Amino acid sequence: MRLLTRVLLVSLLTLSLVVSGLACGPGRGYGRRRHPKKLTPLAYKQFIPNVAEKTLGASGRYEGKITRNSERFKELTPNYNPDIIFKDEENTGADRLMTQRCKDKLNSLAISVMNHWPGVKLRVTEGWDEDGHHFEESLHYEGRAVDITTSDRDKSKYGTLSRLAVEAGFDWVYYESKAHIHCSVKAENSVAAKSGGCFPGSALVSLQDGGQKAVKDLNPGDKVLAADSAGNLVFSDFIMFTDRDSTTRRVFYVIETQEPVEKITLTAAHLLFVLDNSTEDLHTMTAAYASSVRAGQKVMVVDDSGQLKSVIVQRIYTEEQRGSFAPVTAHGTIVVDRILASCYAVIEDQGLAHLAFAPARLYYYVSSFLFPQNSSSRSNATLQQEGVHWYSRLLYQMGTWLLDSNMLHPLGMSVNSS
């Protein structure tokens, strides 16, 4: 019986994934096979994402120069990919040294270049710099940046080369000069390198019994305060963590409201429900990335009478905290520290994200019905291990295949995190 149930659940899961994938089809093209998307070349001096290189939304802050004698030199790894030409004008092999993340993105780009221009290879003119030839705090000093061209040095290709670099996953790409393209990545251990959508473990949720519980202590089956699609407060089943990490330090956005003064702390890619300052209609609220919320907008706060109330955002700042948790409820929403938030992240579409988690909700309800457990045994038996949940990891990977890269937050989860 148990085997049959598992087979049935896997079948339903697979079917739901296929349907969710097809639903991403544009308009009347629903269910049709997508044609390869057209690559739009970057313009001269354009950079993607459209923020400064060493900010949270791009490659993150400078962490210090690496020399051959420093402890961090072991973070660099040589790249001997035969499909990449290294200029290496210093004749020291320095241009081949880079972080593993930079190496992975560069190797991916090399394949794209050969596929796009048969007979042409990727060329690296500058990698790790140990001679001080760049400006202060350049990411070249950490092996996190490369300057690239094509092997034929055809400048008419550089705009498209920039776009290919974006598609390959570099965290910041800059059509810097007529002579080369500049690309960089996040640090391997950077708090910016892995974000996804999370709350700190100390954030509080409200329970149906009137008490409160820290997010990190939630167990499947706990009924927590959330909101339905009409904006009504409800108590919803906590189903799972899409990510559960007790140790990693991450950067969180802190969004603080005016009267009443409340704060919610969440990662950049997490969705928060907002209203424009010009309206009080809760039905017009939309889900926006925490990193895109601005002072003057409104968020939904649970007031003393237990009702949702729109309150103006007073200020926004960032802080580092250790530990991050991403809870999912049956309704796809959750009230954290008295402010209504989504359970989802990375893609700025609450409806699509909630649809994508339909198989997870189905599995929870079916397993709860077939294998009822008391709260203590459920706490011990079903609480997941640390790391990104396999289903969340799968959805993110599918999203990178099916959706345009600009539909995903630049600080989307690391599919290699554990």
From Swiss-Prot:
Q: Per UniProt, which keywords does this protein have?
A: Autocatalytic cleavage, Calcium, Cell membrane, Developmental protein, Endoplasmic reticulum, Golgi apparatus, Hydrolase, Lipoprotein, Membrane, Metal-binding, Palmitate, Protease, Signal, Transferase, Zinc
**Where on this chain does Ca(2+) 2 bind?**
90, 126, 129, 131
* Covalent lipidation (N-palmitoyl cysteine), chain numbering: 24
Lipid metabolism among keywords: no
This protein's name: Sonic hedgehog protein
- Gene it is expressed from: shha
Self-association state and partner proteins as the record states: Interacts with HHATL/GUP1 which negatively regulates HHAT-mediated palmitoylation of the SHH N-terminus. Interacts with BOC and CDON. Interacts with HHIP. Interacts with DISP1 via its cholesterol anchor. Interacts with SCUBE2.
Q: Which tissues and organs express this gene's product?
A: Expressed in the ventral midline of the neural tube and brain. Also found in the notochord and in developing fin bud. In the developing brain, expression occurs in domains that include a discrete region in the floor of the diencephalon.
Q: Where is this site: Involved in auto-cleavage?
A: 267
Q: Where is this motif: Cardin-Weintraub?
A: 32-38
Family label: Belongs to the hedgehog family.
Swiss-Prot/TrEMBL site (Cleavage) positions: 197-198
Note the site residues: Essential for auto-cleavage: 270
Residues the record lists as binding Ca(2+) 1: 89-90, 95, 125-126
Secretion signal, residue range per the UniProt entry: 1-23
The superkingdom of the source organism is Eukaryota
For molecular function, the Gene Ontology terms on record are: calcium ion binding; cholesterol-protein transferase activity; patched binding; peptidase activity
Involved in cholesterol transfer, annotated site positions? 243
**Gene3D superfamilies from the entry?**
3.30.1380.10, Hedgehog/Intein (Hint) domain
Residues bound to Zn(2+) are 140, 147, 182
Lipid-linked residues (Cholesterol glycine ester) = 197
Q: What Enzyme Commission number(s) appear in the record?
A: 3.1.-.-
Gene Ontology CC entries for this record: endoplasmic reticulum; endoplasmic reticulum membrane; extracellular space; Golgi apparatus; Golgi membrane; plasma membrane
